[in-house]
Amino acid sequence: MKTKAFISLIFLSILICCKSEKEKIFEKSIVGEWNFDKFIILKKENNPEEPPPLPFMAKNGYIFHSDKTCIFKPGFVSMIEGKSREENQILYLGNSTKYKIKNDSLKIQNLETNKWNNYKIVSITSDTMTLQKTEDELLKYYKTNYVINPNENYDKIIVSSSGCYGTCAIFDLLISKNDNSLFFGERYNSKNGIFSAKISKDLFKEIENSFKKSNITKLKNRYSSNWTDLNEISVTFIKDNKIIKTVSDYGGEAPDEFRMSYLRTNYLYQTLDLQNKKEILPFQSIGQVSKSNKLIYFEKSEIFYLFYLLLNGKELPAKKISTIYTLKGFGKNDEETEIKSDGRFFVFNNRLIDIGFNFFELNDFTNRNLD
C-alpha cells in the first residue's frame, strides 16, 4: 500500500514537473510582438458559402513582456449609452494589461469587463502563435520584427475622423513634438470643443514609432471599403512645416499596423490635460479652398493643419494682399467667413494673419497625386 502511494506521488510529481516545463516554454516563447493573422473555423457552418465576417476590432495585436504585462495595441474601450444617440460615448480604458499562463491556458485581463479572457495555447513557434478561442474557432497570430528607421522623424502628427451613419466620433487631433497640441471635438466625443494640451516627447515618440511600423512613406494615399456610410480616418505627418504624407482610410481597409496606431490615437485626448482654447478666430473649421474658382482637394487632417497654423499665426495690421486663394470658414452655427490668401497671408473681417510661409506652394496641392 505504501509502495502504491509512493509511486502515485512520484507520478504526480512528474506530471507537475512536466506542466511546469510546458509553462516555461510558453512563457519564454510568447514574449514579443504579435499581430492577428486569421481565423480558422474548425467546424463548417450550415451555410459554408457565407463565412462569418471578420469583426473590425478582431484585427488586433499584442506585445507580451516577460513581467506578465502586455499591450493590447488598439486599446480597450467601453461604450457608455446616453439618453439619446447624441449622448453616446466611447471611453478609452488604456492598452496596458496583465496576462498569465497556466499549463496550456493563456489568460488576458480584459479592462472593459474586468474579467480574464481565456484561450487555449495550441502552439507557439518562433514566428506563429495559434490560440483556441472556442470549440470551433482558432486564432492565428504572426510574430513581428520591425526595423524602425531612426532617421525618419516628424514634428507633428494629425489624426482626423469624419464620422459615419451612426455615432462615430467626429474630431481632429494634432499632436506636436515641441509645441502645444490641439484637439477639436465636434460630435460624439467625451469632450467637444477646441482644446490645447501638452504631451511629453516620450509619448510623441511612442506614437510616432507605432505609425512607423507600418512603413509610412510606402503606404498608399487612400484605402477604401466598398461599403457605404462608414467612418473615414485621415492621418497627416508634418516635418519642417511640410506635409510629408497623408493617408486616408475609409472603412478600416488600411494595413493592420497603421489602423491599430490610429485607433489608439483616436482616444488619446481622454488621457490629456485639456485646456479650453480661447476662440480668437470667427470660425472653427475650414470647409472649402479654391484657386481661380477651381476647388482644391484636402483631406480632413490637412485642412485642420491649416486651421492650426491660422490659430497660431501672427496677427498683423490689415493690408491689401494679392488674392490667389479663397477659403470658407465655418463657425459653431455654420456661419460663414470668407478668407482671402496669397498662401502666406490670410485676410478676413479686416484682420490679417501671417502663418510664416506659403502653405500652398510648400505642399503643392494643385499637383498632388490622390491615388
Tell me what each language-model feature is.
Residues 22-32, 36, 101-103, 108-165, ...:
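Short, well-ordered, aromatic-rich surface patches in folded extracellular/luminal domains
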Residues 36-42, 71-78, 160:
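Generic short beta-strand segments
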Residues 38-68, 166-177, 295-299:
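Short, solvent-exposed loop/hinge segments that bridge or flank secondary-structure elements
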Residues 199-231:
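Short, internal acidic amphipathic alpha-helical interface segments
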